Design a protein with these regions (language model features):
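Iron-sulfur cluster-binding electron-transfer modules in prokaryotic oxidoreductases
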Residues: 72-343
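Cysteine-centered iron-sulfur cluster-binding motifs in ferredoxin-type domains/subunits
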Residues: 3-22, 48-70, 101-102, 295-296, ...
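Non-heme iron-sulfur electron-transfer modules
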Residues: 21-51, 69-93, 340
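Short N-terminal binding/cap micro-motifs at the start of the first secondary-structure element
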Residues: 16-18, 25-27, 174
Length: 343
């Protein structure tokens, strides 16, 4: 990022009015002061860095609101990487190294899930690691999505058209069924689903917890894998899609200019197939559902595609919540010191 791009800030403070953290945490100076205003000071003297920048959850709602298109969240995250003195803790390492924890946990998922669900264990995690006992930890799937995909791979190759599915950590370790369901939908559109030869976590948990060098290495690995073919790349996670497209060059200085436009949300890709004349045999679903728009989907401007797909389901009544951050923000809401703000 150009170091002077923050000069486009017109000091209107609209970013601060939309920031979910500054509303409830008086210790956070807000995106304008933490971002453009603070950057002017930091460029003069790095000692002026404010550790309160750690309260930024990188939801990007400040960037959505900014009339001058200042990359406020990027400025804050890059400042944390460059000037931050606070070293990551063991708790931060556990929460952010999702591939490691998932690989260790999925073979023993029933035992791990039962153990971490016990109140005494949760209180012990709170006392020892500051992982708040009031939070319910995500459950692991028994076996990974990539392992389950092996049984589907031969059939996928039979389709004349193909897409690559960047499944991300949640599908791979926590909810493999979501990946299987996506494959069924994509297959119904006459397209096969391939996986990257080697996929690592997109890097967002590492960035959020201060492991920038590790995040950069994983980004480089993912970009190299994506360059092995020229197929469209779809993701069910808006954060994964956003990170692959925008955070790699903006925060990690990993060039993805040759493949950025190939990456999109699965719902956007599906909507485009339907708009081109393909059809899906949708069964009636007489339910009323409430939908919350993820922050990073809002940032990409792609919320409409998901909502329009849901509205195509016969019998489904859709109510869209006001667009607000959910408060969890990846690993942020699991930390004891952030619980009250997260709530």
């Amino acid at each position: 990022m150009n170091d002077t791009r923050f000069e486009s800030c017109i000091k209107c403070t609209v970013c601060t009015t939309t920031c979910p953290v500054s509303r409830v945490n008086p210790r956070y100076p807000g995106p304008k002061q933490a971002g453009p205003d603070g950057e002017r000071l930091r460029l003069k003297d790095g000692a002026l860095y404010d550790e309160a920048l750690k309260y930024c959850i990188n939801c990007k709602r400040c960037e959505v609101a900014c009339p001058s298109d200042v990359k406020i969240g990027d400025i804050i995250q890059r400042a944390r990487a460059q000037y931050g003195q606070q070293k990551p803790t063991l708790r931060d390492a556990i929460l952010s190294h999702t591939d490691l924890m998932g690989t260790l946990s999925t073979p023993f998922a029933p035992l791990v899930n039962a153990t971490t669900g016990l109140k005494p264990v949760r209180r012990l995690l709170d006392a020892a690691l500051k992982i708040d006992h009031r939070r319910t930890l995500p459950k692991y799937g028994f076996g990974t999505f990539r392992r389950a995909y092996r049984q589907l791979a031969a059939r996928q190759a039979q389709y004349p058209e193909q897409v690559v599915f960047f499944h991300g950590c949640y599908v791979n370790y926590n909810h493999p069924q979501l990946g299987k369901d996506l494959i069924r939908v994509v297959n119904a559109l006459g397209t096969g689903v391939q996986l990257l030869s080697k996929e690592k976590c997109c890097g967002v948990p590492l960035i959020a917890n201060g492991f920038f060098d590790k995040a950069r290495k994983q980004a480089q690995s993912n970009v190299a894998a994506m360059r092995e073919n020229t197929l469209p790349i779809i993701a069910t996670s808006s954060t994964c899609a956003f990170t692959l497209r925008d955070e790699y060059p903006h925060l990690l200085d990993v060039d993805n200019s040759d493949l950025r436009d190939r990456v999109e949300l699965a719902t956007r890709w599906i909507w485009k197939q339907l708009a081109a004349g393909r059809t899906l045999p949708l069964r009636p679903l007489p339910l009323k559902v409430v939908y919350h728009t993820p922050c990073h989907m809002e940032k990409m401007g792609w919320s409409l595609y998901t909502l329009e797909l849901l509205r195509l389901i016969p019998g489904l009544q859709l109510e869209v919540l006001d667009s607000q951050c959910c408060g969890i923000a990846g690993t942020y809401g699991f930390k004891t010191e952030n619980y009250a703000v997260s709530q």
